[in-house]
Amino acid sequence: MSKEDAIEVMAVVIEPLPNAMFKVELENKHQVLAHVSGKMRKNFIRILPGDRVAVELSPYDLTRGRIVYRYK
């Protein structure tokens, strides 16, 4: 999947899960599982419940995503 195919949406982190996974709620009230992108993990970006994040969703599986940005 190329980066152009990904759907980027805003979300709020609901709860942290093991292995750098998070349950996030999208703007349209759907809940999906999201993992932290490699660059955020490399730079030790902390994500806490309540944070607003940008999530990339694959058009093939809309129940899983990748957290690509944490807003201040």
From Swiss-Prot:
Keywords assigned: Cytoplasm, Initiation factor, Protein biosynthesis, RNA-binding, rRNA-binding
Functional note: One of the essential components for the initiation of protein synthesis. Stabilizes the binding of IF-2 and IF-3 on the 30S subunit to which N-formylmethionyl-tRNA(fMet) subsequently binds. Helps modulate mRNA selection, yielding the 30S pre-initiation complex (PIC). Upon addition of the 50S ribosomal subunit IF-1, IF-2 and IF-3 are released leaving the mature 70S translation initiation complex.
Subunit structure: Component of the 30S ribosomal translation pre-initiation complex which assembles on the 30S ribosome in the order IF-2 and IF-3, IF-1 and N-formylmethionyl-tRNA(fMet); mRNA recruitment can occur at any time during PIC assembly.
Keyword check for Cytoplasm: yes
Cross-referenced InterPro entries: NA-bd_OB-fold, RNA-binding_domain_S1_IF1, S1_domain, TIF_IF1
Chief location: cytoplasm
The family this protein is said to belong to: Belongs to the IF-1 family.
SMART domains xref list: S1
Keyword Cytoplasm assigned: yes
GO MF annotations, alphabetized: ribosome binding; rRNA binding; translation initiation factor activity
CDD domains referenced in this protein's UniProt entry, alphabetically: S1_IF1
Protein name stated in the entry: Translation initiation factor IF-1
GO CC annotations, alphabetized: cytosol
Domain S1-like, chain residue ranges per copy: 1-72
Natural source organism: Koribacter versatilis (strain Ellin345)
Subcellular location: Cytoplasm
